[in-house]
């Protein structure tokens, strides 16, 4: 088996070796003369150049370029350069200018006359005039007397089809031929129209249509403050200053501005000696108030943040406290018992009830029963409703009346007696003594007498009277 020889590594060039070994003094003996040009061949050329000029031959240690003219191939002649001369311009003839000749030189030759087209037609008419010129110096005298004959002047228009002024274009006119028929000149082209379908903007719907462009499915609820979480301490505050001046519970300072519905931020936790309420110790923030209802009460709440410790990074850590104060309980709804307006038939005479919706036939009975006093077995006595004194078991109570009010009286029909009366007059038997009272009103109030009557039964019928109305007898 033949062993392969290792490849020979190429040595660096003399220039690269000279750069690194010159300063250290470790260069090989053939590197420095080759780079500095002190070899034997260089010295022979230097010595021979003292007496012989060899600069034009290009002999030296440099790159071979063949000198100034380059290398010339053997058995050939160098190429010759043909010089092509540019013909000379003819000399400009200089014309002599005399003292009396003009100094202006015409740059252009005589130009030819450009044809301007057809001539403008001359004016022709029946009553024209001619202009004559003369060399006389006699002043002209104009006759300003008006002419006796009427002068008619006619004119002719010539249209150039090559050019028409836009301002002189004639617009086609409409001509009325007969009654309601209008004939117009036809125009170029036809005008077409497009049928656009009409859509209804408002139409009756089912009520389930969306009212916004992107309706949100379902109902989104706003999350309230988490006041009753396990990590929140519950503290009840009884001081009423917690509602209006919560900062007075944290510090003794008297601030000029007391924010009510905003978050209160304290710069630093105050020492225990400067905190009026110990429950508000180490408080650095009190959030805005919130009103809630819990277990039948209206509760005023504020969420506070305490600063208990600091970490090495400077961040403060503290607990959250829920301060609350119950304002008032929410009582159950009371049931209001409705009282009937119509009185039963077995009503006692002592119960003074004024029923304005009673029948007309019962008016006389009700009037008779109300005009006398009645004593019941309940231990109190009532008098006529027109009286202002009420006698009870507690003594006499005087009820003052209000100022008199004008009552409008509407008279009834006139009573006309018969013209022929027979004497002696015999009245009809039985005589009709019924009197009717018509009351028209809308507002009713409790009779003041019934306010001082003790109620012992659950269902008590109260009296009513008119606040404003009219009475007709």
Curated annotation (Swiss-Prot):
Motif annotated as Nuclear localization signal, chain positions: 1-12, 452-462
Keyword 4Fe-4S: no
A GO CC term attached to the entry: viral capsid
Localization, UniProt: Virion; Host nucleus; Host early endosome; Host Golgi apparatus
Cysteine pairings via disulfide bonds: 21-27
GO BP term, example: microtubule-dependent intracellular transport of viral material towards nucleus
InterPro entries hit by this protein: Late_L2
UniProt PTM: Highly phosphorylated.
Alphabetical keyword list: Capsid protein, Cytoplasmic inwards viral transport, Disulfide bond, DNA-binding, Host endosome, Host Golgi apparatus, Host nucleus, Host-virus interaction, Late protein, Microtubular inwards viral transport, Phosphoprotein, Viral penetration into host nucleus, Virion, Virus entry into host cell
Main location: virion
Stated family: Belongs to the papillomaviridae L2 protein family.
The protein's assembly and partners: Interacts with major capsid protein L1. Interacts with E2; this interaction inhibits E2 transcriptional activity but not the DNA replication function E2. Interacts with host GADD45GIP1. Interacts with host HSPA8; this interaction is required for L2 nuclear translocation. Interacts with host importins KPNB2 and KPNB3. Forms a complex with importin alpha2-beta1 heterodimers via interaction with the importin alpha2 adapter. Interacts with host DYNLT1; this interaction is essential for virus intracellular transport during entry.
Function (record text): Minor protein of the capsid that localizes along the inner surface of the virion, within the central cavities beneath the L1 pentamers. Plays a role in capsid stabilization through interaction with the major capsid protein L1. Once the virion enters the host cell, L2 escorts the genomic DNA into the nucleus by promoting escape from the endosomal compartments and traffic through the host Golgi network.
Name of the featured protein: Minor capsid protein L2
Natural source organism: Human papillomavirus 28
Organismal lineage: Viruses, Monodnaviria, Shotokuvirae, Cossaviricota, Papovaviricetes
